[in-house]
Every structure is written in C-alpha cells, then in structure tokens.
Regions:
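Structured loops at beta-to-helix junctions and adjacent beta-edge loops in soluble globular domains
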Residues: 68-69, 139, 185, 253
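Short, well-structured alpha-helical interface segments that form or flank functional binding sites
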Residues: 91, 95, 124, 163-170, ...
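A short acidic, glycine-rich active-site loop
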Residues: 153-165
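Metal-dependent nuclease catalytic regions and adjoining charged, substrate-binding loops involved
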Residues: 22-25, 158, 170, 174-286
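Metal-dependent nuclease catalytic cores that hydrolyze phosphodiester bonds in DNA/RNA
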Residues: 1-135, 142-153, 286
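A structural signal for short, well-ordered beta-strand segments and their strand-loop junctions
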Residues: 130, 134-138, 179-184
Length: 286
C-alpha cells in the first residue's frame, strides 16, 4: 500500500463487515450533505458562460481547449448518461471521505484556490482534500482505467488526456501545499488504492500550464495535438487510419477530422465488433 490511510480504511471496512465497527450519525449526515450538494450542483447550476481556463480543464489537450474557446457551437453534445457518470463520481467522493472520517483519518476538506502564474494570469479551482499536508484528489475510475491507467505515476503520465497531473499540481501550488496523489476507486468492484504523485516535477508541469494559458490567451492558430495512427490486424497494417484514444474522447473530433467515420471495426472477426473512429479507409477495406 502506498499510503497509511489505505490500511486504516481497509481495516475499518473489515471490522464493519464483521459487525465490529459502525459509522456515526455525524458522518452519515455529512455524506448526505455532500451528496445533496452534488445533486444541486449537477442539476441546478447555471450553464457556464464564456470560456475560461479552470484547474479542472487546464491539463486537457490544447487543441480541445482551442475549440472550447473558439468554436463551442460545434461541440458534440454529451449523451444523457454523462450526467449520471458525473453524479457517480460525486457520490464516490462523498462516500470515500466518509470512510476516511470513520477510519479516524484526519484531513482538511475541499477548498477553493487561485493559481497565480504571474503577470496577472490566474486560474481558479477547488481541490478535494489535504491529507498530511499534501493535496490529494479523489477519482472514480472504470475497471480498465483502474487496472491500466492508475497503476502508478509513470503509467498515468503516458496517457493523461484528462489532465489529472496538471490539475493536481495546480491545486497544490494554489494551496501552497505539497503534491500528494490520487485516491482511486474502481466503480466496477469497489476496490480503491492510492497513487502517489509526490515525485512529479512540479515546475515542469507549471511551465506547461503557463504555455497552455498563453496559447489560448494569445489566440494562437489551431494546431492538432495528435495525428491519426495506422490500424493493424495481427501486427500487419490494414491501410486504414484511425484516431488515437485521446482523440476518441474529444467532443470536437468530427469538426477536427471531417473524414471521420465512427463504425464497427472493418477487420475484427468478433461477433460484437468494437467501434472504431476511422479517418481514412483503404479502398480494399471499403
């Protein structure tokens, strides 16, 4: 285990299952309040107005942020279940904080910060918690992300398209605290773990945040962050090109790639073929 609090929570859960531990009304009331606030935020908040950088989006690909600022009308709407997914994340955070409290883990609850980049450049955000003097974030993850992405800091760095690392570093800098890590909860199994990020080069990350801020503030021309990749089947190229995983999650992929066709795989032999974002289909595959 990467953090002493992991053992505390696991020990509490084991005792609770054995009938040897319980949760106080004060803690259940706090969890209920947090869930209620999440429902109010998700359903009753006013739509965001003009684009601005926030700690929650500053680490996303710059090409995506460029569209958010300059071409928001071409955004593909999120499906209705996206709201449910956001709610699940809020509920997981509220319950996990309740478990920390029930386990006797002391922490400072969420707070607002302003990251000062100098020259009157600021980005606002809200961190999840401060534990042992370090800023931590709570993430709910799919089973795949839990097992393949949130393995350690290095694996996350290789595919951080949602900007979790800049987000955490920005929170820590804005709060004038050290970088902690992520409490990651598997939405499929209930497993949880701590992914330590204390070894991150914060100055390098902050420089990247500043570069992103300047790129958008100076109205730089659009530039893709990723290129299409060759499709392979049994290690052989098919002649088709498809989007990267990062582009596949982007709400502007159809605007960015006019030839995009999101269709079942043209080469898979499976009964239920995976859906692929093709941007070029070879004639022989058409």
């Amino acid at each position: 285990m990467e953090h002493p609090a992991e053992l505390s929570v696991y020990s509490f859960l084991a005792k609770a299952m054995a009938g040897e531990a319980s949760v106080s009304k004060e803690i259940t009331d706090q969890v209920a309040t947090d869930v209620g606030n999440a429902l109010d935020k998700q359903f009753n908040s006013k739509p965001r107005g003009e684009f601005r950088l926030r700690m929650s989006n500053v680490g996303r690909p710059r090409c995506q942020l460029w569209f958010e600022k300059n071409d928001p009308e071409d955004k593909t709407p999120f499906p209705p279940h996206f709201l449910m997914n956001m709610l699940l994340g809020d509920i997981v955070e509220a319950v996990f904080k309740g478990l920390l409290r029930a386990s006797g883990v002391q922490f400072e609850d969420n707070g607002n910060i302003t990251l000062d980049l100098g020259d009157n450049k600021t980005i606002k955000g809200e961190y999840d918690l401060i534990l042992d003097g370090k800023v931590d974030d709570i993430k709910s993850a799919s089973p795949w992300s839990y097992n393949n992405k949130f393995v350690n800091l290095e694996t996350l760095k290789q595919g951080d398209s949602f900007g979790y690392i800049p987000q955490l570093v920005g929170y820590a800098k804005g709060a004038d605290k050290d970088v902690g890590g992520w409490w990651v909860v598997n939405k499929g199994t209930g497993q949880f773990k701590y992914v330590n990020a204390s070894s991150i080069d914060s100055e390098e990350v902050l420089n990247d945040i500043t570069d992103t801020y300047n790129y958008l503030e100076n109205d730089e021309p659009f530039e893709r962050c990723y290129e299409a990749v060759n499709e392979t089947f049994y290690k052989a190229r098919t002649g088709n090109k498809k989007l990267t995983i990062e582009c596949g999650f982007c709400s502007y992929k159809h605007k960015c790639w006019p030839t995009l066709q999101t269709i079942p795989s043209l080469v898979s032999k499976a009964k239920e073929k995976p859906i692929v974002d093709y941007v070029h289909i070879a004639k022989e595959a058409a």
